[in-house]
Amino acid sequence: MIELHSSPTPNGQKVMIMLEETGLEWKHFDVNIRLGEQFTPEYLKLSPNNKIPAIVDTDGPGGGPYRMMESGAILFYLAEKTGKFLPKDARKRYDTMQWLIFQMAHIGPMFGQANHFNNYAKDNIQYAKDRYNNESIRLYRVLDNQLSTNAWIAGDEYTIADMAIYPWTKGHKDRGIDKAGYPNFMRWFEAMQARPAVQRNNKMADEIRARMAKAAEGKTPIDMFNTQDNAARLSRATGH
């Protein structure tokens, strides 16, 4: 059994897709980051960096429970555990790892900052908006170029690299990404949307959001983007 302690953000969804694709038995444990549940002492035992997602594999290496944080590492772990979606061929395997790390190092940080400055920042900082929006568009071009000669992100096989990138690209329309300018990306995105596991993920993500919203009724949300407050929350939770 895989326990997924998470929220339906892009990083949470990439693991949900992998779990659905592999057919592993799993259960979602809601972590409402808007309420600060990622700072509870219990959750920090799973993810010391107070980020989602985290997993507990009740049948981990050696047969006992094993916990893990960081979505990219979790994808790699689940691929190793099941022997699925990470090619055995050395070149294809390294290609997959390159593009998985590309998502972690570039798409996640840049798309996340664009979303923050477009939708959540208290100050309207045009420089920040331009920087992150333009870099996001550049990254879509990188994807489109890569997909011009490959069926999937890392080559001719569907892999964890595709699962990692897809949830981050659901908002492509907000960046003006369309078939006319990015035909290869759009072909890939539609292929992802057609996968049953991805469709199940999208449905579950909506259900989890609704469940979390209902559970949060009457409660005061935290300011997730106040880094000083977040440091204080972490200190209080850990006693350091």
For every predicted segment, state its role.
Residues 86-88, 110-113, 151-156, 199-203:
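Short, hydrophobic secondary-structure boundary micro-motifs
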Residues 79, 168-169, 202:
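Active-site-flanking alpha-helical
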Residues 106, 110-115, 153-181, 186-194, ...:
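GST superfamily/GST-like fold recognition
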Residues 55, 74, 143, 162, ...:
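Residue-level signal for nonpolar/aromatic packing positions in well-ordered secondary structure
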Residues 1-130, 134, 144, 232-240:
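GST-like domain detector, emphasizing the conserved glutathione-binding G-site
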Residues 135-138, 142-146, 191:
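Solvent-exposed, charged/polar functional surfaces in cytosolic regulatory/catalytic domains
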Residues 52, 146-153:
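Cytochrome P450 catalytic-domain "roof"
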Residues 205-240:
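Acidic/histidine-enriched, glycine/proline-rich intrinsically disordered or flexible terminal extensions
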